[in-house]
Amino acid sequence: MQVTLAVLSATALALLAISCGGSPAAPLAAPSPSVDLAGTWDGTGVDSQGATTVTWALRQTGTSVSGTVATKSADADGSCNSCHRNKTGTFSGTIAGTTLALTIFFAAGVDGDPTPACTATLTGTATSTVADMLTTAYSGADSCEGQFLNGTLVMARHR
């Protein structure tokens, strides 16, 4: 009986020592984004107000994406839509897994903007960020022309 009690006591002390030993685990590093969107992208945007050619120049730090945007109307020069679709602006976005949430903003008063009194903002989500292709659903508004709905951007990256 004394031997059994001694063995049980020794085993309990050994388990206690093992469970208290060692250092705490180091914190896990933040996961790296699963997509890299840095670079120059060209494509087209089509929404309820018309079609636009689009160029992005993007930088990426971790899961944050930023850069510049230039758009040019697919309509003939001189049309109302051509004025409101020829703009330069800013791009900001956040990556979560393989999804990109983005905002594009066109400020009023930009040099060379044919409609300098108008601002425009669009927001969208790209759930298909495969290699050098990206498809984004978007919506937004132009302060002079109103809302644009049911938009789709299809972009390809230059390599």
Walk through the language-model features, giving the residues of each.
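Sec-dependent bacterial lipoprotein signal peptides
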Residues: 1-19
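Intrinsically disordered, low-complexity segments enriched in Ser/Pro/Gly/Ala and basic residues
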Residues: 8, 18, 22, 31, ...
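Bacterial Sec-dependent N-terminal signal peptides
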Residues: 16-38, 159
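Central antiparallel beta-sheet cores of small beta-barrel/beta-sandwich binding domains
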Residues: 33-125, 145-158
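Low-complexity, intrinsically disordered Gly/Pro/Thr-rich segments
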Residues: 129-144
